Design a protein with these regions (language model features):
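Generic C-terminus detector
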Residues: 533, 546, 559-600
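Conserved short alpha-helical segments that host acidic/polar catalytic motifs at enzyme active sites
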Residues: 1-238, 242-243, 251-285, 418, ...
């Protein structure tokens, strides 16, 4: 911030708006009478606020950061900002050649005080400043030496109206105020201060002064257009809910309904997509890629697209995809899924696909994000800000978008008659009401949670399009309750996982009635015969058939198998939530996790 009022309160508020991303320490630095002063704290922002209350930081120019540890433990000494008497730095990303640079700088007399890769940036700039370079000369010279991904903001002693930022592989934006200027990794942090945003492109650096921002790339001045952000500065609260996760689960009927209202023509019951710069009928194949829950949504989308649209589809974990260097056929479509639109591995997969000549479509919840801006077209999940680290409404929104997209592809390719597309669309249109019905069944799931909370290991099983929901259920349980859980395709049970089953291991089956039900029921019989505690998530027909072997049954509304993965995602979220609450974990910000993973 280069402000008119004290910077520290603005920085602290901005960090609060980024709190959802996950972090383990935080800090702020400002210029006080031309000197750099810092306040840092381990743990939550409340600790930093207490440090600022005890020792206030004046000054109208400053930088702030919430850190998710990569190099060095989450301690006060390793918290950002890092720096020297001449320069302070905050950094998202990883400096891959920090060890070589550190050795070189120590040999030149620079004295390091932390274990972090970020301090290398500060020491490199400091070394150049000591040799007589100006900040505007030292910063780009340092950036040219860095390898890896980064978004950087630098504060210089004696320069009260100067910030320098740089971006490579991690997001950074400039905000324009009234005789104030801002730098931020997320437009949401700047939303209360400005609606005028300019995004740095990969490899850019920027000199920010009180009323101007000068952008540079490859040593030359460039222009970067201001855009009006659609993000609001309104505070995001939990309302009457205990946690953001609980609130966001209960928002799912409305989110799904809003998406269907946007993506389905009310008169014809046909899917409607925004204008696309490529012809879906001529796409030769698709490659879906994402991380975490988004990858499980991609797996579900693969099932839908192949089975009803008859198009070859691959679904890949983004962090593995580009390192395989897969050959990609002409006229292919890459579909990238990311809630934040900033996931580093997914962005890298996008760039690989684009370099291979693929058309690029992204499914994102932030239409101004890096992934969205790098795409030819986007499908916006319009779920609104998701604050809890564990994805709920963004996940079911991704599924809903992919389901409608699959129907649109099927229609474009003539893979299904309109009558069948209308029938499947009708099944999707039942989701908002049936999702609300599932959420109203909270007491039954809470009772089940008391049993699951005692387990050390849990298995989730699913088949077909519900196999990824088993994976998602296991992920949800492990990430917020810290119980070891694994998801498997039900048919794979006898190929290894059955060795784990005994009376202490709950086996949770995502098992709606339909064409695949009997096969999954046979797998559950195998588990029950070995003492497994069978927990069935099914509709009234399926639940009745499995009641004899089930230790517990969660009965869901009957729904067409096409729409079942979206509906069945909700009770597995609810179960994980209640188990986590019973175990007393930090539901919204579980240990070691970050919401937006901007490092590879």
């Amino acid at each position: 911030v280069i402000g008119k009022a004290e910077a520290a309160p603005l920085l602290l508020d901005g960090l609060r708006r980024l709190e959802y991303r996950g972090y383990d320490s935080a800090g702020i630095a400002t210029l006080v009478n031309g000197r750099i002063e810092r306040r840092r704290a381990e743990g939550k922002l409340v600790n930093l606020a207490a440090a600022l209350a005890a020792r206030p930081l004046p000054g109208v120019t400053g930088i702030g950061h919430t850190r998710w540890a990569t190099h060095g433990a989450p301690t006060i000494s390793n918290a950002h900002p890092h720096g020297t008497a001449r320069v302070a730095v905050v950094h998202n990303g990883i400096i891959e050649n920090h060890a070589e640079l550190r050795a070189e700088l120590e040999a030149a007399g620079q004295v390091f005080s932390t274990e972090t890769d970020t301090e290398t940036v500060a020491q490199l700039v400091d070394h150049l400043l000591k040799q007589g370079a100006s900040p505007e000369e030292a910063a780009p010279a340092a950036f040219a030496r860095l390898e890896g991904a980064y978004a950087l903001a630098l504060l210089f002693a004696g320069h009260s109206e100067l910030l320098i930022g740089a971006q490579r592989g991690a997001p950074l934006a400039v905000g324009y105020g009234d005789a104030e200027m801002y730098l931020g990794s997320d437009a949401l942090a700047m939303a209360p201060l400005t609606q005028q945003i300019a995004y740095l492109e990969d490899g850019d650096w920027v000199v920010v002064r009180r009323e101007t921002a000068s952008f540079f790339a490859a040593g030359a001045a460039v222009s970067r257009a201001k855009k009006v952000t659609s993000l609001t500065g309104a505070a995001i609260g939990k309302g009457n809910f205990r946690h953001f996760m609980e609130k966001e689960m209960h928002e799912q009927p409305v989110v799904i309904g809003d998406l269907l209202h946007r993506m389905v023509d009310a008169a014809s019951q046909m899917p409607v997509l925004p204008a696309l710069p490529f012809d879906l009928a001529k796409i030769s194949h698709m490659t879906l890629s994402a991380c975490g829950s988004g990858y499980y949504a991609a797996l579900t989308g693969k099932f839908w697209l192949e089975s009803i649209s008859r198009v070859p589809v691959e679904a890949d974990v983004a962090s593995e995809f580009r390192y395989r260097a897969p050959p990609m056929r002409e006229n292919g479509l890459g579909v990238l899924l990311s809630q934040s639109g900033e996931t580093a591995d997914t962005l890298a997969a996008l760039r690989y696909m684009a370099a291979q000549g693929q058309n690029i479509l992204s499914v994102v919840n932030v239409p101004e994000s890096s992934i969205a801006r790098a795409s030819e077209a986007i499908l916006d999940t319009i779920a609104g800000p998701e604050i809890s680290v564990a994805s709920t409404k963004a996940f079911t929104a991704q599924l809903t978008v992919l389901a409608v997209f699959a129907l649109a592809v099927a229609r474009a390719r003539g893979a299904l008659p309109d009558t069948e597309i209308a029938r499947l669309t009708d099944a999707l249109l039942e989701l908002p009401a049936k999702a609300a019905e599932v959420l109203a069944n909270d007491g039954t799931i809470h009772a089940l949670a008391a049993r699951i909370a005692e387990a050390r290991d849990v298995l989730y099983l699913g088949r077909g399009a519900c196999y990824p929901i088993a994976l998602e259920g296991a992920l949800k349980l492990k990430e917020i309750s810290y119980i070891h859980a694994e998801g498997y395709a039900a048919g794979e049970l006898k190929h290894g996982p059955i060795a784990l089953i005994d009376k202490a291991v709950p086996v949770i089956a995502i098992c709606p009635s339909g064409p695949l039900f009997e096969k999954t029921a046979s797998n559950l019989q195998e588990a029950a015969a070995r003492g497994g505690q069978i927990v069935v998530f099914s509709d009234p027909v399926g639940a009745a058939k499995l009641r004899a072997i089930a230790a517990a049954t969660i009965v869901l509304p009957k729904i067409d198998p096409f729409a079942a993965p979206i509906l069945y995602a909700i009770p597995v979220q609810m179960l994980a939530y209640h188990v986590a609450v019973l175990k007393g974990t930090d539901v919204d910000q579980p240990r070691n996790l970050a919401k937006s993973v901007t490092v590879e």
